[in-house]
């Protein structure tokens, strides 16, 4: 594909967006929501050591969104689609665009600090431990495609929020006009 684009440092982009949010007056609070109290005018979030009232809230907590929605009486058939990532060390540019290996269900992409292999889909909920067999398969298959890959620098597993129809939940709560949902993959 000519003219394709990708980023070599997705974290740097996320950090720039976050910094702009703060610069424009956004407030970042990193606490667990313990409960929500709702009435006709507002919603109060009860967190670990804070209470804050809002006119409206947007619930966009990814795979954890259902835990908050349940506090409001809304229930969704949300599950977790787990994807696995391996970062390989390399001192040279091995590929110049994302490369898919459809047989094994993963992509390879050159990023600023190595080559990332990521993919596969596993429906396994929020709390199950990572499946090391999937990481081993991705590493083995990646080395078949790019034998010059270096050592494994890091591995991690991500949790994508998924619904049976693969469509996201976007819109107002049917039970509370003060709540907007925005999650799903």
Short names for language-model regions:
Residues 10, 102-103, 143-185:
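C-terminal catalytic lobe of FAD-dependent flavoproteins
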Residues 1-56:
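Helical element adjacent to the flavin cofactor pocket in flavoenzyme catalytic cores
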Residues 44-46, 116, 180-181:
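General beta-strand recognition
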Residues 25-27, 115, 179:
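Short, conserved active-site loop motifs that form the nucleotide-linked donor/cofactor pocket
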Residues 47-96, 148:
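Central helical "cap/lid" subdomain
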Residues 111-147:
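Conserved FAD/dinucleotide-binding core of flavoprotein oxidoreductases
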Residues 5, 105, 123-126, 179-185:
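Glycine-rich phosphate/pyrophosphate-binding beta-alpha loops
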């Amino acid at each position: 594909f000519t003219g394709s684009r990708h980023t070599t440092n997705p974290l740097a982009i996320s950090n720039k967006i976050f910094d702009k949010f703060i610069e424009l007056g956004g407030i970042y609070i990193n606490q667990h929501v313990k409960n929500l109290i709702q009435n006709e005018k507002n919603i109060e979030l009860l967190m670990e050591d804070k209470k804050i009232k809002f006119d409206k809230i947007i619930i966009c907590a990814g795979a954890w969104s259902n835990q908050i929605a349940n506090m409001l009486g809304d229930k969704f058939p949300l599950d977790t689609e787990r994807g696995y990532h391996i970062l390989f060390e390399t001192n040279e540019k091995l590929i110049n665009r994302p490369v898919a290996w459809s047989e094994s269900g993963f992509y390879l992409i050159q990023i600023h600090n190595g080559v990332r292999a990521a993919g596969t889909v596993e429906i396994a909920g929020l709390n199950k431990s990572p499946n090391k067999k999937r990481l081993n398969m991705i590493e083995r298959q990646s080395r078949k495609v790019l034998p010059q890959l270096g050592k494994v620098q890091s591995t991690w597993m991500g949790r994508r929020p998924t619904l049976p129809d693969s469509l996201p939940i976007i819109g107002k709560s049917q039970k509370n006009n003060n709540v907007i949902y925005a999650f799903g993959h």
